[in-house]
């Protein structure tokens, strides 16, 4: 049996979150450009391939941005909902790799 190694607060940037930020945030262009240069932030299959180098390696995921810097009071509740839904999808799809996520608040 392989022992579990759980690493917490690993940053991800789901593409749906990037898309929403593109639509609502004036700070987004620079942040999105930086985020999209690192495939394991937004490409979960690439992340899983990287993780498979270490048997039993799991991640508790969180978003790679502070919500308040990407959306104002009018948009941050929707951004938090989208973010939490996307992180849940990732965890539900691969609970063997992502047993939990850190929820975001507006």
Where are these regions (language model features)?
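Helix-coil boundary/capping segments in enzymes
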Residues: 1-106
